[in-house]
Amino acid sequence: MIPIEIDSGSGFCFGVVNAIRHAEKQLEKSSDKLYCLGDIVHNTLEVERLGKKGLETIDYDAFSRLRGAKVLLRAHGEPPEIYRMAGENGVTIIDATCPVVLRLQNKIKSRYEATRSLGAQVVIYGKRGHAEVNGLVGQTEGTAIVIESEEELDKIDYTRPVILFSQTTKSLEGFGQIIDSISTRMQPGVTFEHHDTICRQVANRIPHIGAFATAHELVFFVAGEKSSNGKVLFGHCLAANPRSIFISSPEVIVPDMLVPLPASIGICGATSTPRWQMEEVASHIKALL
């Protein structure tokens, strides 16, 4: 039998585990309807599993119409506007914001309030429109500049102070490149401060995933189609091992993917991929061999 290894370093990060525990605890102790603002995790199968337990996912429009309900805020965090709206509408918040994200929100809010009178610009290196980034921008009353890549650095006014932060799940390498590029553009005497706000539990998975991928002839990377972290990690996985395949469920694996038969098979995933899903993938592969 071809050896199959599930990566011990893959699976939910602490923030996601914490949010799911919050949801399950609330569902177990109360019969009251529990809503979640947005997918609790970017993994369709896990969302469906919790949905069967009673967790109902809603969007922001539906949230604005709720009255007297109970709503879980996921690990990504939310802007102040959501808390204000909840208070006005009698909505009870179950706050499962990741502690790492919460610290970052507070740091951004503090620096924004301390420097806005000086004309400083808060810049966030992250994915525009991502839930976490929306929550971070909200700490600056919507004024923060979001930068996805070096190509967007012209949005910054280099004659004014710059305060740079990063979305917690971005790569250290990418953040370092942004810091270097901004540094070379700053006008003499103008302040530039940068804060390393990247979660190490997530960042450390990048070198780990590469080492895991090279240790196996064939790799199946398991993640939801919506997972930003999954796309980033799979890119590193593929770079380390060209015979890496992205899948979102076990059913998509067909016998042809196993040809030629590999000496070993590795299964890994994103920070939004549950362990049980990777185990299902392993079982499916064994049935095909």
From Swiss-Prot:
GO terms for molecular function: 4 iron, 4 sulfur cluster binding; 4-hydroxy-3-methylbut-2-enyl diphosphate reductase activity; metal ion binding. GO terms for biological process: dimethylallyl diphosphate biosynthetic process; isopentenyl diphosphate biosynthetic process, methylerythritol 4-phosphate pathway; terpenoid biosynthetic process. The active site is at residue 132. Its EC number is 1.17.7.4. Dimethylallyl diphosphate binds at residues 42, 76, 130, 227-229, 272. Pfam families: LYTB. Pathway: Isoprenoid biosynthesis; dimethylallyl diphosphate biosynthesis; dimethylallyl diphosphate from (2E)-4-hydroxy-3-methylbutenyl diphosphate: step 1/1; Isoprenoid biosynthesis; isopentenyl diphosphate biosynthesis via DXP pathway; isopentenyl diphosphate from 1-deoxy-D-xylulose 5-phosphate: step 6/6. Isopentenyl diphosphate binds at residues 42, 76, 130, 227-229, 272. It comes from the Bacteria. [4Fe-4S] cluster binds at residues 13, 98, 199. Its cofactor is [4Fe-4S] cluster. (2E)-4-hydroxy-3-methylbut-2-enyl diphosphate binds at residues 42, 76, 130, 168, 227-229, 272. It catalyses: isopentenyl diphosphate + 2 oxidized [2Fe-2S]-[ferredoxin] + H2O = (2E)-4-hydroxy-3-methylbut-2-enyl diphosphate + 2 reduced [2Fe-2S]-[ferredoxin] + 2 H(+); dimethylallyl diphosphate + 2 oxidized [2Fe-2S]-[ferredoxin] + H2O = (2E)-4-hydroxy-3-methylbut-2-enyl diphosphate + 2 reduced [2Fe-2S]-[ferredoxin] + 2 H(+). Keywords: 4Fe-4S, Iron, Iron-sulfur, Isoprene biosynthesis, Metal-binding, Oxidoreductase. Binds 1 [4Fe-4S] cluster per subunit. Catalyzes the conversion of 1-hydroxy-2-methyl-2-(E)-butenyl 4-diphosphate (HMBPP) into a mixture of isopentenyl diphosphate (IPP) and dimethylallyl diphosphate (DMAPP). Acts in the terminal step of the DOXP/MEP pathway for isoprenoid precursor biosynthesis. Belongs to the IspH family. This is 4-hydroxy-3-methylbut-2-enyl diphosphate reductase. It comes from Porphyromonas gingivalis (strain ATCC BAA-308 / W83). The lineage of its organism: Bacteria, Pseudomonadati, Bacteroidota, Bacteroidia, Bacteroidales. The gene is ispH.
